[in-house]
Amino acid sequence: MKPLAVSAITAVTALGHGLAPTLAALREQRTGLKLQDFETATLGAWLGVVEGADEVALPADLQAYDCRNNRIAELGLRADGFAQAVRAAAQRYGAQRVGVFLGTSTSGILQTEIAYRHRDASSGALPASLHYGETHNTYSVSRY
């Protein structure tokens, strides 16, 4: 197998946005989990919540993809100059030779859970406001 060059990395997690807060948390042996109140849960839950994700505005042409998961992806593009590094690599090598590898998240699931709560009582149809293919679908973030 031919080795691949990795020329830019970043991370956006409950530890913070970018590599610096991630490294700091690892060195300090600090978790990103915090006790949270969540929806209608009656007991406290320790969650890894990405700060600032709810305030992110996606580009106008990608509004159909608006969900927490894709807002976190947008934060990743903005962190550590990652989007600029991808553009530079595409310019240098051609877009067909550049790959972006993504981790997974369940952060978009709440939007789908809320949609299921509002299904049509007679038909069972989900609300038109749920853009499943652009938000909860497994491939949503890579399409975004």
PLM regions: where:
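Conserved "HGTGT" condensation-loop signature of ketosynthase/thiolase-family condensing enzymes
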Residues: M1-Y144
